[in-house]
Amino acid sequence: MFAPLLKKLFGSKNEREVKRMLKTVQLVNAFEEKMVALSDDQLRAKTAEFKDRIAKGETLDQLLPEAFAVAREAGKRVMGMRHFDVQLIGGMTLHEGKIAEMRTGEGKTLVGTLGVYLNALSGKGVHVVTVNDYLARRDANWMRPLYEFLGLSVGIVTPFQPPEEKRAAYAADITYGTNNEFGFDYLRDNMAFSMEEKFQRELNFAVIDEVDSILIDEARTPLIISGQAEDSSRLYIEINKLIPKLKLHVEEVEGEVTQEGHYTVDEKTRQVELNEAGHQFIEDQLTSIGLLAEGESLYSAHNLSLLTHVYAGLRAHKLFHRNVEYIVQDGQVVLVDEHTGRTMPGRRLSEGLHQAIEAKENLNIQAESQTLASTTFQNYFRLYDKLSGMTGTADTEAFEFHQIYGLQVVVIPTNKPLARKDYNDLVFLTAEEKYAAIVNDIKESMAAGRPVLVGTATIETSEHMSALLEKEGIEHKVLNAKFHEKEAEIIAQAGRPGALTIATNMAGRGTDILLGGNWEVEVASLENPTPEQIAQIKADWQKRHQQVLESGGLQVIASERHESRRIDNQLRGRAGRQGDAGSSRFYLSLEDSLMRIFASDRVKNFMKALGMQSGEAIEHRMVTNAIEKAQRKVEGRNFDIRKQLLEFDDVNNEQRKVIYHMRNTLLAADNIGETIADFRQDVLNATVSAHIPPQSLPEQWDVAGLEASIASDFGVKLPIQQWLDEDDHLYEETLREKLMNELIAAYNEKEDQAGAEALRSFEKQIVLRVLDDLWKDHLSTMDHLRHGIHLRGYAQKNPKQEYKRESFTLFSELLDSIKRDSIRVLSHVQVRREDPAEEEQRLRQEAEALAARMQFEHAEAPGLEAQPELVGEEVDVALAAAPVRNEQKLGRNELCYCGSGKKFKHCHGQIQ
């Protein structure tokens, strides 16, 4: 009730933030005259002066006004660009660890230099994160002259980079790279076998460009390093033959069955389910081809893998469509990003889904993979001491940024007032009528000399639009996932008079559409252009620029609404950059997926009740409200999925922190003798307690079992029964002491034989390898736990609490296994004396030999009830890989196959 009044009196929170920063802008401006008077050398010397002042205790906040003034003056001299006052506000927002929302064309890249320069003065490093390698290289090379003028070094991290080159890039003051590369390097560092192999320093400050794309759109997709698992291509091929035989089961709202079938599809959650008839049909089919034993159920424990393959095949056929979710290119299934329309070469769906699509398309089926290390962007970026970001569209997701990352969004005022006109949506009954209206709008705009950008949600739609335009004889360029190599070139010239560009979603994001075209691209295409040629190109561009402005600027036409309002706003933001003229219009139909799935029947009935004729459109607030309500509903559902992923990964993250801390401590230590001694003590205590229960009588002791366990775990045969017979004073505590003394003596004897230096080095390598191997198995176990944990809800149990409880138990067992297996290997192995340099070389060669079987994945995470597809990016890297396992693998906690009655991990599953 009082909120509007208070807002009117005191302004919104955003307005108060901007007003506060304007005071600091005045301080920066006060330094400008002084900076102009400095020579280049004097201006450059300011960087060393600032570093010295920081060393003496001055803070970055205290340096900010003068440092920003230095960066602004350097920008004028080196780049020929002066930071506007609103850009200074953007720089302050970044420095304070917030998100700056800036309209398209307001100079986000230049704004970034302010916060980056100030924070790089600390000497702790700054990471500038972009959405793709092209933008990382472009921005780094664009701003490199400015930073180097100020005495700062710049590095770029890219895939397939030589290790020394990548290490140098991370050692630079400012490092550019993609979110994927920074995340994978973090995982690689935590798989290194020496401190020298690591790349990253402490994670200090990151500036994320297009922060909404990275922290929101890609937040559901974990980063995974994996190795190859067993080959099951025949299974995919056989099941692929069965899926087309299944029929869709359809029910009306009242529950009346209109079509009997085997499976149902929920388009909202993108899930497909077999019904009872479907299960029976599949079981009969699998039995007939020999994949399922007679009378067995798909739900038997040993058939769950088969059930997973069936569902993968079903989803591949019914939920994934060629030229929508993926394309086939060079004999491979290439995924398409639903948010940008870009292809994602190398990225693969997991849980067998990618292989199922390959089988569906009759392509070569690639092997599945096993997780070796993983994290999420949510948890990776929260490792930075300070995080900030820039984007043109963040305000609609402000709640999520604050809830998940603790980041505040500040909307930065535009340098010039926004002149773009955003027209109301036009809604048609059918898609055919909608497309006809779009073509008419295009003709009118082009006749007026306006450039036109048509945004589509899928490749299929863009190709359909292209076909319609070709039929009309209208010249145009298509920018979608199939032609993304030409993105920058096409987008750069999309602002020419009468130019028509069809773009899938936000393809080409990061490159501005300049009215009249981009004259710099024209100059760059010439070989050794003369000053006269450059002047002529500029003059021609100026004429075109003025012509487009007078005709009304860029016209943005959207062929449908996206699930997210933010993506719609990004498309609108293509027009009207830096106060230019422009307009936008969305064309919709009741056949659009968003309207069909989420808009209520009431809206459809309302439109039909109006008696609309063919080709007529409606502009009504009720329809617009219904669309926005549907978008909010989808955004809320997607937020819940991302939040759920984080809640589950937070459990994994705490375990990840413990393991990675243990690993880094081992790597940094020259001597881990104390750690080995602690392991030995813990393993012995656990072994004794297992055979001598607390407060038990000697008659209850399992002495024979204790002797066998000591021999198995420590490689020493001790006559414990004989000791007890000969010494009446041996009770539980004194027996532990005697056992420990014997074990230490045996280990010291091994050390005398091998040499202390050789054994110390060997200890570290063995513990690291045991830790990595068991951690890999633990990750696999945790994955299986998470996939099935939602079923606990049927037993009236909280799945999240159950997951936390069971994962804690599994992690405790993991830590025990690391100790036991490390001691077991060290106790049994025979260490020979060898030159330490030779040993290091041997280990390095071993790691390189295994590297070919490593993969990178950027995978879509499963939810609880709905389990979305897992997306992964597979790239060869120079890291030690897991061995390929072709045999059936027993779980660590299953009974051993030898019949001993022990768990597999405590018997033949221990490292030999």
Swiss-Prot record:
It is found in: Cell inner membrane; Cytoplasm. InterPro entries: Helicase_ATP-bd (IPR014001), P-loop_NTPase (IPR027417), SEC_C_motif (IPR004027), SecA (IPR000185), SecA_DEAD (IPR011115), SecA_motor_DEAD (IPR014018), SecA_preprotein_X-link_dom (IPR011130), SecA_SF2_C (IPR044722). ATP binds at Q87, G105, E106, G107, K108, T109, D512. The keyword Cell inner membrane applies. Belongs to the SecA family. Part of the Sec protein translocase complex. Interacts with the SecYEG preprotein conducting channel. Has a central role in coupling the hydrolysis of ATP to the transfer of proteins into and across the cell membrane, serving both as a receptor for the preprotein-SecB complex and as an ATP-driven molecular motor driving the stepwise translocation of polypeptide chains across the membrane. This is Protein translocase subunit SecA. It comes from Pseudomonas fluorescens (strain Pf0-1).
